[in-house]
């Protein structure tokens, strides 16, 4: 797979990943981490210099948490958003105890999504991502807008969830120290 954007070229060789594996991507800005995640998510990207399609997406189900928070206005409560987007996960005791409680989603349930802070929205977005049934979880910058304690908690939640569910994840962080804990 090759992605070309001006002078920037991202080449990916064939690789493998297994269940219960988290691949953490670290690197300087502009090195292709988000582009790689978007490729796996199936986002439309560029055409290479020869005019051919730049990537082929393997067939698997994906749950994707974008690095940027949506500017879309959700005129609903967090409870309604969760019940609409991940009703099955929210009904599972293990998901509630392993994801919702550590991320403190319960205390946000009756708040309007639009009125949440950036960190609160980030925690909800992470819960929504993990609440979707998928083979691979693509988690782009899950620690953005979170304070240091919340970053550690979010990293532990991701790790525990992926290991227990025997899934694979690609996670992009600016700080590898946080995920290593």
From Swiss-Prot:
Top-level taxon of the source organism: Eukaryota
Family recorded in the similarity comment: Belongs to the ABC transporter superfamily. ABCE family.
An example Gene Ontology molecular-function term: ATP hydrolysis activity
Name of the protein in its database record: ABC transporter E family member 3
Segments forming domain ABC transporter: 20-176
Disulfide linkage: none
Organism: Arabidopsis thaliana (Mouse-ear cress)
Binding of ATP, residues: 27-34
Organs and tissues of expression: Mostly expressed in roots and leaves, and, to a lower extent, in stems, flowers and siliques.
Keyword terms: ATP-binding, Nucleotide-binding, Transport
Annotated Gene3D superfamilies: P-loop containing nucleotide triphosphate hydrolases
A Pfam family per the record: ABC_tran
InterPro entries: AAA+_ATPase, ABC_transporter-like_ATP-bd, P-loop_NTPase, RLI1
């Amino acid at each position: 797979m090759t992605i070309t954007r001006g002078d920037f070229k991202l080449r990916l060789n064939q690789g493998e990943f297994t269940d219960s594996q988290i691949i953490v991507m670290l690197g300087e800005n502009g090195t292709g981490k988000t582009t790689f995640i978007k490729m796996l998510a199936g986002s439309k990207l560029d055409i290479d210099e020869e005019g051919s399609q730049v990537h082929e997406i393997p067939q698997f189900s994906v749950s994707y948490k974008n690095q940027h928070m949506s500017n879309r206005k959700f005129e609903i409560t967090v409870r309604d958003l969760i019940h609409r987007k991940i009703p099955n996960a929210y009904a599972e005791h293990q998901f509630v105890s392993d994801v919702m409680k550590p991320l403190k989603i319960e205390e946000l349930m009756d708040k309007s999504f639009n009125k949440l802070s950036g960190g609160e929205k980030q925690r909800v977005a992470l819960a929504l991502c993990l609440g979707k049934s998928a083979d691979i979880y693509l988690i782009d910058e899950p620690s953005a807008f979170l304070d240091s304690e919340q970053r550690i908690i979010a990293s532990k939640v991701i790790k525990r969830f992926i290991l227990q569910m025997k899934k694979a994840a690609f996670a992009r962080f600016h700080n590898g120290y946080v995920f290593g804990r």
